[in-house]
Amino acid sequence: MPKRMQDLPEEYLTNQHALARAIGARVRLRRSELNLTQEHLRARMELEQVFISRTQYSRIENGDVLPNAAELIALRAILDVPFDWLLLGEKGEP
């Protein structure tokens, strides 16, 4: 297993970045539909026992990073969307 990001195959990095951007766009879209600010959503994540900085949350929405498992679970619950929509953008549209 590669120990550094630069040791990962280019295809993996390209797919990972594309997935991060797509998830971030869906999170932003659904947050806007619910009329929540980033800060409101972040505060609700804390109620779900997921503590995330303002910067980290912004990086998720901007597609700079993939959310971890706990963040995905909290986002799914708060945004009231199915995991398949959040991750893949298909089936069970919100």
What are the roles of these predicted feature ranges?
Residues 27, 38, 54, 69-72:
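Helix-turn-helix DNA-binding elements, focusing on the entry/boundary residues of the two helices
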